[in-house]
Amino acid sequence: MDVFKQMSFKELMKVLGLGTVAFVLGVEWLNWLTRRLRDSRGPLKEVLFFPSPQVCVEHLFTSHRSFPCACPFPHGIQTSFSRLLEHLLSARTSLEMCIFSFSNMEMSRAILLLHKRGVVVRVVTDRDYMTITGSQIGALRKAGISVRHEMSSAVHMHHKFALVDGRKLISGSLNWTLTAVQSNKENVIITEEPELVRPFQQEFLKLWEASDPANLKLQSKNGQIKK
């Protein structure tokens, strides 16, 4: 402290300035090192297989909840389904989904939570399956989420993929249903590899535009939909 007392104001400001610069450079160096370490591992690549055992996932939705909660399911266990929910809930700006069948309540809860957080959610789904018993598409629409569906009754929108923040792809055989998650032999791949993400971005945008009612005309003579 005596050293600082003996310094002039100008000298003290110089020392403080150098300290600030050193701090900023240190933070930048740490950020650079973090990026290098991440880049050395390459883009995210993860594979999930189903069926997945039923465990408690409440902690993914409520950060302040005390555990164990009152539900009868095992706690503190990571499964393919909990990992899938974690990836979905990692969205910060956008979530784009092409989903054939969507009736899983926990996945619907995750999407609604993202919407509540301000994440822009867009959904393209199948014309027929969006109205089957248990479908969560109606709940998404009721919450104000933008949903479009395949216009033609002759084909199905059979994709099952999602894009998180435009950089993370979630894709596989898994329908977003309870049966698929808990009973079926299914697979999901999660990746941030740009060469794989980009084509799915293009496919989503193509289907989103093709499913826009404003771009379609209904031919009354034969009941077919024509652009």
From Swiss-Prot:
The keyword Amino-acid biosynthesis does not apply. One of its GO terms (cellular component) is mitochondrial outer membrane. The keyword Acetylation does not apply. It is found in: Mitochondrion outer membrane. One of its GO terms (biological process) is meiotic cell cycle. It catalyses: a cardiolipin + H2O = a 1,2-diacyl-sn-glycero-3-phospho-(1'-sn-glycerol) + a 1,2-diacyl-sn-glycero-3-phosphate + H(+). The chain crosses the membrane at residues 15-33. It is an enzyme of class 3 (hydrolase). Keywords: Differentiation, Endonuclease, Hydrolase, Lipid degradation, Lipid metabolism, Meiosis, Membrane, Metal-binding, Mitochondrion, Mitochondrion outer membrane, Nuclease, Spermatogenesis, Transmembrane, Transmembrane helix. SUPFAM superfamilies: Phospholipase D/nuclease. GO terms for molecular function: cardiolipin hydrolase activity; metal ion binding; protein homodimerization activity; RNA endonuclease activity, producing 5'-phosphomonoesters. It is a single-pass membrane protein. Its EC number is 3.1.-.-, 3.1.4.-. Residues 34-227 are cytoplasmic. It holds the Pfam family PLDc_2. It comes from the Eukaryota. Disulfide bonds: none annotated. Signal peptide: none annotated. Residues 1-14 are mitochondrial intermembrane. The active site is at residues 158, 160, 165. Residues 153-180 form the PLD phosphodiesterase domain. In contrast to other members of the phospholipase D family, contains only one PLD phosphodiesterase domain, suggesting that it has a single half-catalytic and requires homodimerization to form a complete active site. Homodimer. Belongs to the phospholipase D family. MitoPLD/Zucchini subfamily. Presents phospholipase and nuclease activities, depending on the different physiological conditions. Plays a key role in mitochondrial fusion and fission via its phospholipase activity. In its phospholipase role, it uses the mitochondrial lipid cardiolipin as substrate to generate phosphatidate (PA or 1,2-diacyl-sn-glycero-3-phosphate), a second messenger signaling lipid. Production of PA facilitates Mitofusin-mediated fusion, whereas the cleavage of PA by the Lipin family of phosphatases produces diacylgycerol (DAG) which promotes mitochondrial fission. This is Mitochondrial cardiolipin hydrolase.
